Swiss-Prot record:
InterPro entries: G_patch_dom, PINX1. It is found in: Nucleus, Nucleolus. The modification Phosphoserine is found at residue 230. Residues 157-168 have a biased composition (Acidic residues). Residues 147-239 are annotated as: Disordered. Keywords: Nucleus, Phosphoprotein, Ribosome biogenesis, rRNA processing. Residues 175-203 have a biased composition (Basic residues). Belongs to the PINX1 family. One of its GO terms (molecular function) is nucleic acid binding. This is Protein PXR1.
Amino acid sequence: MGLAATRTKQRFGLDPRNTAWSNDTSRFGHQFLEKFGWKPGMGLGLYPMNSNTSHIKVSIKDDNVGLGAKLKRKDKKDEFDNGECAGLDVFQRILGRLNGKESKISEELDTQRKQKIIDGKWGIHFVKGEVLASTWDPKTHKLRNYSNAKKRKREGDDSEDEDDDDKEDKDSDKKKHKKHKKHKKDKKKDKKDKKEHKKHKKEEKRLKKEKRAEKTKETKKTSKLKSSESASNIPDAVNTRLSVRSKWIKQKRAALMDSKALNEIFMITND
């Protein structure tokens, strides 16, 4: 496109290769490794020849193979190890027929198959116990004793003492067991008594609350009655306009009820 292409701005940071953190010797990891004898330039790993001198890089897993499958493929034992292809053993047999080594290749493939079965999921490896083999007598079908007669006598005496000690231990264990049972029963009784005591306290509190509620209800009722009686004795508040009108009506009624007042109004004289 040349100069006619669209221009795109690019901004580069101060550390485009992201190496500032690895070159910084004041970080905790750098100082911690130096305490164990590590120096810049040395690798990390079990073996110094195969140690990693560069940073650990993340590789993208773009297949459905399990973890460690690629490493297993790389570490092939021999030329007949079919780590990658499933039908490679058949191909090896065809090559063996052509080269005249069919028997050797078939034997090698059979041994590999047997080894796979043994090392598979249900394969079991039996390990002989050297201690059992050295102390077991196949004729008498008993364990061998290499001690002398004196030691046997001592062992017999020790066994008698041990039997007595075992009896004493059993008796003491029985006593301890009985004491433990009694202790458990006492604990259960104490728990029951505590529960009953708590229930009794709760019932007493509930009764007290009910009594208090009844008393408060009675006091409220009496206060309401007193307030109603006092309210009946208090006259109703009348507005000022109505009070003036009521006075005028009373005066008018009084004038109409009085005969003398009417005569004065109508100017009637009693001759």
